């Protein structure tokens, strides 16, 4: 690896627009953005970007698995192994996410994932852990037998089991004990995501006051309501989330979980309100169908772009981050710079890391992907200024 690199013949995708300038990287950081005809010291290695985009590395804050692993199965080195493969789909940072398990299994899984973070030295950055549950009002595909009530004690149990590496928790905030649980988690700067919830829509501003700052998989496991018998459209939970500017909205942009026209509707919000997440499970990214046991007796299949239980219930997704980017660009009709905010910058901000990553800006990590302009496929992925994946 060259200690100093100058990426030229590229278009930089930044939060404020595209820039036909050169990117200077020293060691693991972006140190400057300069005009193409500007002179810099001779010790910068010239890298020809072949007229590709330089797009910020994508950050997936909800990921239950990828290819051969489901993180809930607690297989040794599962996240370490996947970290080496995720650059192929444009992911430079992610939160392995946990399902609803019995208490002892939850503690063991969280501890194992925490240890994996310490061991991981190659590939995508494992940025922390996302506990999706166990405090749900609506279980979705999760095991309803493993749901628990929120409490301060549970919050501390999750924090302790992850050795301080807990970055996000999805919770139904209408449950008894949720306020105290949320406020305890916020003391450790943990992002609180409303999800699997049937909360009163009028309570959403109060939840934001408590510390809820995001919504998990918008429109999914969040009930909407039709017009009432008099023809009045009542306020739904998703309406209230859209209206609450303090809450960022997580979106599984596979064209299955959320109708493309609803994606376009969300895209009219300010760009910093929406972020892309995959909710991917084992088998995502696989070219062949994959079957697995989500929990004892609950079998799932991943095929034809969809992850579902044998009885047809959606069970996460088979989406990859690069597919989500491509879909969001198509459905939202936003510019590629605006899409980069949803794919990279807002996820980083949600988990408190936007000062270090999430955009092509000076003094941030040199984590980015070279995207071909003609088809938006990945040509190469760089993490800390080092090439970690290159397409054939």
Language model features with spans:
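Active-site core of metal-dependent hydrolases
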Residues: 156, 160-287
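Metal-associated gating/positioning segment near the N- to mid-region
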Residues: 50-108
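Active-site metal-binding motif and surrounding structural segment of the metallo-beta-lactamase
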Residues: 37-55
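N-terminal metal-binding scaffold of metallo-dependent hydrolase/deaminase domains
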Residues: 1-40, 375, 382
